[in-house]
Amino acid sequence: AYLYRDGKLHQITEDQSMVGEMLRAGAITEEQARSHPYRNVITQAVGTEERLSPVVTRILKTPGDIWLLCSDGLTDMARDEEIAAVLADCQPAAAAEELVHLALQHGGTDNVSVLLLEVKA
């Protein structure tokens, strides 16, 4: 999940994957993570284990916030700066389509799922 607020894109959740853990530990760079052979090996997912260890974060909503929920089909193909530029330039309905188009333009072969939620006053 990402939060677009005041012209900046913030990653709220962290990938619960082998590569995500390596990245957080400083063992690899973001560039290495993008093409790492284990980038799709997940360490926790709903429905795979009897017990989960969810990470819960509370964030106060602010009018104008845009929440982005998306699959790695988007984030593997588009950089945060590109995603932020689309969110800055388009209304949410158009931005969702534009983000899918952006991922496909960059050669995306994975499924691309995008959900945008705009916080109103």
Give residue spans per PLM region:
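A short local loop/turn or secondary-structure capping micro-motif enriched for an aromatic residue
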Residues: 1-2, 18-21, 77
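Conserved beta-strand-loop-short alpha-helix elements that form
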Residues: 41-50, 60-86, 100-102, 106, ...
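Conserved, helical-rich catalytic subdomain that frames metal- and/or nucleotide-binding sites
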Residues: 14-63
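ATP/nucleoside-binding phosphotransfer catalytic cores, i.e., glycine-rich phosphate-binding loops
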Residues: 92-93
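Residue-level structural signal for beta-strand termini and adjacent loop
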Residues: 7, 14-15, 83
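Short loop segments at secondary-structure junctions
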Residues: 6-8, 119-121
